[in-house]
Each structure stands twice: as C-alpha cells, then as structure tokens.
From Swiss-Prot:
Protein localization: Cell membrane
Transmembrane segments: 7-27, 57-77, 107-127, 163-183, 206-226, 252-272, 281-301
Keywords, ordered alphabetically: Cell membrane, Membrane, Transmembrane, Transmembrane helix
Keyword Transmembrane helix: yes
Similarity comment: family membership: Belongs to the UPF0182 family.
Biological classification of the source: Bacteria, Pseudomonadati, Pseudomonadota, Gammaproteobacteria, Methylococcales
Membrane topology term: Multi-pass membrane protein
Name the UniProt record assigns to this protein: UPF0182 protein MCA2716
Annotated GO CC locations: extracellular region; plasma membrane
Amino acid sequence: MGNWKRLLTSAAVVMVVLAGLLLAIVLAATHFLVEWWWFKSLDLGAYFWLRFLYRYILSGGVTLFFFLIFFLNFWAASQYLGVDQAIYAAGSEESRYRRWLRMFQTGALPVYLPLSVFLAVLVALPFYHEWEAGLLFFFAPAAGVTEPVFGEDAGFHMFRIPILVLIQSELLVCASVLAVMVAALYWVEHEFSPAHRRPWPRGARIHLNLLVVLVAVVAAWGYVLQRDELLYVDAHEPVFFGPGLIELRYHLPLIWVEIVSLVVGVVAALWFAQRHRGLKLALTCALVWVSAAALRKIDVVPQLIDRFVVKPNPVKTEREFIKYNIEATLAAFDLDEIRTIDITAAPEGSETIDPHVREHLHNIPVWDPEYLDDVYQQLQGIRPYYSFTEVDTARYLVNGQIEQVNLAAREINLAKLPEEARNWENIHLRYTHGYGAVITPAAQSGDQPMQWWLRDLNMHSDVGLTTEKPDIYFGLENLDYAIVPNRLNIVDIASFDQGSSQNYSGNGGVPISSLLRRLLLSIYFRDERLFFSLNITENSQALFHRNIIERINTVTPFLALDRDPYIVVTPQRIFWIVDAYTTLNSYPVSKRMRYKFRGDTEEREFNYIRNSVKIVVDAFDGSLDYYVVDHDDPVLKGYIKAYPGLFQDASAMPPLIRDQLRFPHDFFEIQMRMYAKYHQTQPELFYQQAETWDFAKVGVRLRDGRTVMRTVAPYYFTTQLDGCENMQNFVLINPMTPIGRNNMSVLAIGGALRPDACGMPYSKSIVLYKYSKDVQVDGPAQVSAMIDQDAEIAKEFALWDQKGSHLTRGRIIIVPIGRSLLYVQPVYIESTSSVKIPELARVILSMGDIVVMETSLEAALNKLEERLIALQKARGIVPVSPVRDSPGMHPM
C-alpha cells in the first residue's frame, strides 16, 4: 500500500512539473509569436529576426566556444586516466572506487557532456547581457579620431576594449577552473593507481603544462588590457578625468614589468619542471612579478610622488594630461566646433532699440508652456476624458511668415473616466484614441482674449493649420491595448467623426483575422474577454505598445530618447518627432556624466553622445521611421551595418516634417553642462577653474508666498541671426553666469544656422555670445531683483494680490539686440478658487536699468523706448547704434 502511495505521489509531482513546463513553453511561444506579428505590422519583420539571430548566434557562439574548451580538455584528460583493468575483477572495497573512477575514463559522455554544458553556460552568462555591445565589436568602424595617450584610434577603445575585457575575464575563469579540475582528475587517478609512486604520464604532464601556460597568457593579456583601463581613471576628479603623471609614469611601467615577468617566469618554471633547469630565472621572475604587483597595490609610493612631485607643481606636472582630458571631452560631446563671439556690452544708459525688433515682436513667447497646460485643459479639453500631456513649442508658416507657436495633442486619458465607466468595453473598444490638437501663437496681449490658431473638435482654424485625420491612437499617455475597428457604433465619444472606431483604416496593429490569433492575443494580454467578445470582427486589429516612447524602446532599445517629444500638425495627419541619441561610456579620456533620458528607469552614465537620429511616429497608425542626421557618428554607423534597412537618410523625410526639425533640448542641456567647465581649453585656466560657468538662476515665487531659486531652463525662440539674411532661425537659448555669481557671462544659442547652410531647417552648431568683463551685464536673477524693486510694478502687484487672485511671473526671455540685451517677462494671474485658468495680465520689459510694464509687447516696447530716450537726454549720453560692428553680432 505504501508503495502505491509513493508511486501516485511521484506521478502527481511529475504531472505538475510537466504541466508547469508546458504552460511556460506556451506563454513563451505566445509572447514570441505576438511580438513577431507586432514587428511585422510595422514592416520590421526582417529586423525582428535579425535581432533574434544576432542575440542567439552571439550568445550561443560564445557558449559553444567555452563548451568546446571544457569538453575537449576533459576528453583529452580521460585518455590519460589509466587505472589497471585487472583491479576491476577484484571484489575488494577499493575496487568500488575504481569502478566509480571508470566513469571518467575514455571521455564518457554521461559525465563530461552535462558538466561541460553547465560550466560553459556559467562562464558565458555575462555575454548574454552584452550581446548588443558585441554587435558594435563586429560592425562599428574606426572612429577616425586618434586618442591622445597611446595614439590609437578612439574606436578601438570605444567598441573593442569593453568586449575584450569581458572575454579576457571569462577566459581566465574558464582556464583557471579547467586547470584545477583537470589537475584534480589526474591526481585522483594517480592516487588510485597501483603505480601511484611512478611519475605522472608524460601526456598528462604536457596537458597540465599547456593549461598553466594558457592561464599565464590570459593573465598577461589582462595586464595588457589594464593598460587601456588607465584611460578611464577618475582618481584626479574633480580636477580632471583620466590618467595623470602617476598612472602613466608609475603604474604603466609596472604593468609592463608584470607582463614580462609573468610570461618569462611561467616559461622558466615549465622548463624547470621538464628539464630541471632555469629555477633561478623562474624564482627571479616570480620575485619581480610579486614586487611589481605589490608596488601597484601599495599606495605609499604614489602618495610620495603626489606629495613631493605633483602637488608642489600641479599644473606643470599634469599639464599634458589635463589637455588630453579637455580635447577628448570636447570631441566626445561634439563641442569641438563651437563658435564664440566676444561682445562688449553697450555702456549703461546708451542702449537703443533696433527698429527691426518690432518686426519680430510676434515671435517673442510670452506664454510659458507650463502655464498653458492649465489653459488648454480648461478651455479646450472639451470632454472629461481628454487631456493635454505636454505643451510644445514650434514654428509654422502662417499668412506668409514664420510664427512661433505653442501646441499640444488632445489625447485620451482613461484615468479621467468615472469609476463606473472603466469597464473592459469602454477601455478597449470605445474610448480608444484622442482627437486633434490645439495651436496658439506664442506672442499674445494681456488686454485681448486668448488667440487660437487651431481649436475645438472640428479642427477649426482661421489660418489653415487644420488636418484631415486628427485621430491620435499613439501618443505620450500610457494606454492599454485597443481593438479597432469593431462593431460598436461610436457617436461623439472618442472623436468628432461618427463611427470612427468602426472605420479605422490604419495598419498599426496586429490583425485578429482568425480564432487562433484571438486566442493567442488573449493569452498574451492575460485577458479572456478579448477571446469571448462579440464586438470584434475579422477586420479588427489589436493596437498595443501605444506609448510612443515604449514603442520606440521596444524596437530600438539601444537608442536614448529625448525627454521632449513634440507633435507636428500637417494637412494630412499628426506626427510625433522624437530626438534619439547614441551614447557610450567608453570614449577614451572623456569626462563621464549621468543623465536620465525619456523612458529610462534610472540615470545612465556615458562619456560620448551624438544626436544622430530623428524618429517620426505617425499618431494615427503608429508607423516608425528612423532618419539619420549625423552620418559621421561611428556608433550609428555600426548599427546601420548591423541592421540594414532600418535607418534612412534625412533627405527622405517629408518636407513638412523636415521643416519642424530642431536642435534637441536634452542634447543642448548636456552639452552646456559639460561646456560650462570644458570651455577653459588652456590647462592652466582649467586647473584654476576661474572661469567656470553655471546655468543662470532666478527667484520664483510659489503659491504659498515663498521664493525659491530655480535654474533657467533652455527655451526655444524664433529670431533672425547674423549670417543668414531674412531667415528665421528656431534656436535654443540658454543664459550662463559665472559660478557663484548672478551677472551674465555667456548667452548660448543652440541650432544657429551657419552662413553656408542657411537653407536648412535647423543646424547642429552652437554659438556663444561671450560678454566682456569690462561692462556689467545683468543676469536673470539681477533683472528679477530690479523688477521687485520697481515701486510702480510692486504697487500693481499688491493690488492684484488683494483681489483674491494669485500673481505669477513667468520665465525671463532674453532677446539679443546688437550689443544690448532685452529682457521680457510675462505676468500671469489666476483665481485662488478650485478652477485655475491662468491669464496673461502684463508684459515686463527691461533694458539696462530701466524696467517697464504694459498690457502688450508693443505697448511695453514703446514705453521702454520713451524711457531710454528721456534718460539719455537727461544724462547727455550718446546712444550706441544697435547695428553690429563686429563679426557675429546682429540685430535680432
């Protein structure tokens, strides 16, 4: 009876295990199949298989390599396991052990095969996570830039060294484990042998000697790679990054001593083991190797060198190495071609307003995107389930001229549905998409109602900015899957057009054309209601990965994404543009930084970055197009070779979309964060850090009355810069101040068109307006303080605060005008009630020490000009002409 119970229990356990295994296989196969269908829906089926093959060919190839090393060595060792066969006839206890040993003889598959597989997988495991880097190892070309320390191509260190370090470390583990296990096999066999007092077989000794040589060679190779790792030393931070005098003049020679002494010592030791000669040389090499290793580990000598050589003469001793770091960092962050224009600001009181300024008033953005979010939501949300996730800035051709605008996509937000309406049918079949966008001019007046250039669900536009297909199925909201078209008759719910969910004509989903597909999709989504729903037709498609960031990361996880995706409204459809970056953390001698990109769960560390790709996502069908805008990026060149057909040239981009390209926000912020220190290209100046910059800061008044200092973020501005006559330039502007100070030092302009490329929609170049120290130039914080001290403005602010309204001052916009700067700051008021709709109340202008406030830009500019003229007459000051008198200076 007991046997039957044990048998039934064993059978039940086996059935449960098999059922669990079968379930895991079904789930894995379903996930694989559905993901393949999804890639096929994007016309990326070949790309899907290519990534799949790369991953498993590289991972499998490495595993097979280590498997062969283990198995062939175990097999070879088994040939020398020579237990006396006569002993097996004996019935003694000892013969049992010898019979057990017999299993390891003659390359027995039951032992060596599973053991080799287990060890190979264990050793190759790190490669499974680095297969993407392995692609660059094989496909990335030379960088075409020589690193300054060893004179090698930077691409060798960027793409080859990281994989070689991984190979060396795992090969050393493999060789060491193999040598120990083979030696143990030989020892056990020899101890059980009747002739255990005899010397080991010659073949066994040769085998072990070869394994020892392998360990020594791989270890020596590790020392060679340690030489390259010196390029990433951070011991001299925060002064500079990379190797210094101690690393290159002390540690590097010791590394070579370790390499030579190890190789020669091992060869001498093996020679002594075979011929009993060379012991003295082997011991000498061992002593030298131990001494060199000890000198590298012990900090006494480096500390003495640092104390008595480096610190007394830091610039002289480290000058060469500081220069290496500066040059490498500027190259790695694409900062080595920045143009700097030195400007001496107009003396105080001599400023004049250029007549051309009035022509550009319509492009001065007095509405901050962060305040427009509430305005759009309250006035254009229209339905409770619509929301505006982000407000973007762009420029469009309106009535024959370029106008800067704010715009936002009206997306579906299922979290705003009433709790009782959040059922399966509503979420997946009815409320499936957003609808349209809103566009407002960036320049508005406080004495007029909000002006709209695209509004309402009927896509009304008085300036021709409407679109034929405004449905937004793919956006920034984290949406669940949707099934369209379906049998539900949607009227005035998810869009303005009736029956939109019945007539979906896009190709951005996985077709549900059979019962099997419906079953597999139900398993994939863990949702049985999809299988049993009667509202799904044979033409229905499953739309998923609908968040555009998730969508892009699913296809190309090797690209970093800008935190500011933006929409483009064309006459046909609405599109999203996402700036993508290639990053690496292995550019030699380049300073590292950390940054959190869109979609990242944590900050990533890198010391090389390029904005090489612009990704266009169709908001209607979710199609993805990758356009190359930097053909010189070696990282992207590697991916282009690895994935032919995925990337296309920017010239293939539709003109209306290409016209909306711009200098990306995150890239500019990263570059300026690094350039704030690394613009000091002279090692002496760099060491002193006397001219380090910082992002300008300004005081912001919170709703509770407190004032906090916040960094002035880069902002987009449409203007006309010198070099391209009559060309409106959409640029990023970022004011920089000396570190610890508030006066303006530099006005950085990202995306300034070069004179030789005026016809391009945007430029990748950066221009710096660097202001002389001879004349004080106020920074945003100082201008804000002047506004606070203006009695007339303070009086009006106090009156508003007493009327149950909350007053907020927006960001300070800096407009360069010749040798002067015009500061613009909008003033908003909003009710303290639960419904908050900010209103533009006033516009403040400041130039020099004059501050004025009016209801519109034009009125404020007139008042400012009157005050300037009056001041100059009163003081007898001769006004300075705003027309440029040196290269690069410009009227706006």
